[in-house]
Design a protein with these regions (language model features):
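N-terminal secretory signal peptides that target proteins for export/translocation
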Residues: 1-13
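N-terminal, motif-rich segments that launch catalysis or mediate targeting to/interaction with membranes
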Residues: 31-121, 134-217, 246-251, 260-430
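Catalytic glutamate of the conserved HExxH
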Residues: 126, 130-134
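A short structural micro-motif
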Residues: 130, 223-227
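Short, surface-exposed recognition loops or helix-turn segments adjacent to catalytic cores
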Residues: 216-224
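Eukaryote-specific, cytoplasm-facing alpha-helical/coiled-coil scaffolding segments in long proteins
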Residues: 226-236
């Protein structure tokens, strides 16, 4: 039977979870990263033992093992922080800034401003995300093109997130589902034992320094946004993964005859944590089966199209695995540099959707994000603008640029030019 007479309090809790799951699905239609959440966590895990943990102990020699375990939770929280704005109660303006404007400078600010073990681990997680996007997105863009021949005919061998949001979401989530299916990800119990934490103070400082805005200028309720993000990362997205494994059961069985159901089910459960992590997953109960029923029944129209994942082919999975290997290699190199004499690294400001250097007309979303930022700064009378931010914006809007970018009206362009003119005459720091 689909349901087995669960008690009313469990039904109420399930209804709340269902609302949150659908909320994340609908919010997911607004944006995504090069990888889905589980892959971002796995990047941290793949570098943890031989790079991140030794770096933390080197920088904070008095940290205990318990301190290091707690720092791991902040690394997990940091590795998806650039996507905070895409979750319910977030703001796409926040995530657009972190992906398209001074993407490298923001991570450098986190690393520079981190003043304790937890905030530094959080910054390292954000570094992992930056590298994952810059190194991973070109491969994912090619995988989307291969998975959707019509899009390939329209856009070419690479299909960017801006060119088709839903195709990216479905492709990236499909990579995660298959990796869970093959038992390649770190145990769900381990993720949940470690937890997910956000270092709000360092996030606020780095955001203000990088963008000349307060965090609550773009996140109307930062605490609610962060709390929902943590809930989504630790509970709701694993629930969605588990539902996807149920709904795609037949296709996964067909692809892998040795399929073992227990290893396909992903769920975080604090109450059932065991010291031996293994790959044991809870069997689908009435909640999972009902969620799967809802997902299968709802018409895949509008934002709900994103709920219908695209499973990778051998060719696209190879692209994914290659990109993960490259990401981890680059991440380890940067971590080794951080342990060097200067303790600093230089990160280029790249468009996190394409991996290319950020420049005018390179990417429509970058153009739109710069325009909105400079207008917002003008609205605040440029109060928090630093010389570095001013120089970055002035470089983006070079003096020889007189025509508006694609898809921007002449009226909107005039507003941008007025704001840029006000910024040009500013002398921050004097």
């Amino acid at each position: 039977a689909l349901l087995s007479n669960p008690p009313p309090n469990r039904i109420a809790a399930f209804i709340l979870r269902l609302v949150l799951v659908l909320g994340v699905v609908l919010a997911g239609a607004r944006g995504t990263a090069a990888y889905s959440m589980l892959t971002h966590e796995e990047i941290v895990d793949l570098a943890w033992a031989d790079r991140i943990e030794p770096l933390l102990k080197h920088r904070f020699p008095h940290a205990t093992e318990q301190d290091i375990n707690e720092a791991h939770a902040y690394a997990y929280g940091g590795c998806v922080i650039q996507d905070l704005g895409y979750y319910p109660f977030g703001s796409k303006d926040f995530s657009n800034l972190l992906h398209y404007v001074r993407s490298g400078d923001f991570v450098e600010a986190l690393l520079r401003d981190a003043d304790d073990l937890d905030s530094y681990a959080f910054a390292l997680g954000a570094l992992a995300h930056y590298i994952s996007d810059v190194e991973g997105h070109p491969s994912v863009n090619r995988a989307v093109a291969l998975s959707y021949p019509k899009l390939q005919r329209k856009y070419g061998k690479e299909v960017t997130y801006d060119e088709d949001h839903r195709a990216h979401i479905r492709t990236e989530f499909g990579f995660d589902v298959v990796q869970v299916a093959k038992g390649r990800f770190t145990s769900d119990d381990y993720h949940n034992f470690i937890g997910f934490q956000v270092s709000k103070p360092v996030l606020e400082r780095a955001f203000r320094e990088t963008y000349g805005l307060q965090l609550d200028d773009v996140l109307k309720n930062p605490d609610l946004a962060i709390g929902t993000y943590r809930r989504s990362v630790s509970k709701i997205i694993p629930e969605m993964t588990r539902v996807a494994l149920v709904t795609k059961h037949a296709e996964l069985v067909q692809e892998n005859p040795d399929f073992d159901q227990r290893k396909f089910l992903y769920r975080l459960s604090r109450t059932e944590y065991e010291r031996q992590w293994g790959t044991q997953y809870q069997k689908p109960g009435w909640r999972t089966r009902f969620l799967a029923f809802v997902v299968q029944t709802l018409p895949k129209v509008g934002p709900l199209k994103s709920a219908d994942i695209t499973l990778p082919t051998p060719e696209t999975e190879e692209l994914y695995i290659h990109s993960v290997n490259k990401t981890v290699d680059v991440f380890r190199e940067k971590l080794a540099q951080l342990r060097g004499k200067s303790g600093r690294i230089d990160l280029a400001n790249r468009d996190c959707d394409t991996g290319h250097p950020t420049k005018p007309s390179e990417y429509k979303l970058a153009d739109a994000t710069y325009a909105k930022l400079v207008e917002q700064l003008a609205g605040n009378k440029f109060q928090l603008v630093t010389p570095e931010l001013q120089a970055n914006i002035m470089a983006f809007y070079g003096s020889d640029r007189h025509s508006p970018p694609a898809d921007m009206s002449a009226e909107e362009w005039r507003k941008v030019q007025t704001a840029v003119g006000g910024l040009r005459g500013l002398h921050p720091g004097e």
